[in-house]
Amino acid sequence: MVTRRVDADQSVTNFGPTVIGRAISVDTAHTLSDMLANALQSESSGALVPGYRIAGKTGTAQIPGPGGYEENTTIASFIGYGPVDDPRFIVLIKLDRPTSSPWGSETAAPAFSQFVKRLVVLLEIPPDTIRQAAQAGG
């Protein structure tokens, strides 16, 4: 992405992002968020954060080398956001060549959970039940 241009006379022109449209509809975004959150809850994920409904996805990728993929090494990841009903953060955890396990679900997801447990305190995001009660006027 081009962010600036420097002309021969050293004058600089900066370019900001341009919104060209919506990638998916609001309804589709809500459906996808529900699917991601439900999948995490149903698999007793290490990414869960008590009191918060989180949406996210694990990833595990082989590492390419000159003669093919490296043996027994991966890039493990987890990307998640929340709270699902009013997202305030998105976090990506990426681990190159994790040693305890090659899987994102066993390495990056628990790291995400530990990070987000601290993040919700730092950002002063109340648990879902408290936020929803406040929104309902109670």
Give the label of every model feature segment:
Residues 32:
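Serine endopeptidase catalytic core focused on the charge-relay Asp
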Residues 126-138:
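Short, highly charged C-terminal tails/helix-capping segments
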Residues 1-19, 36-124:
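Active-site beta-strand/loop architecture of penicillin-binding DD-peptidases
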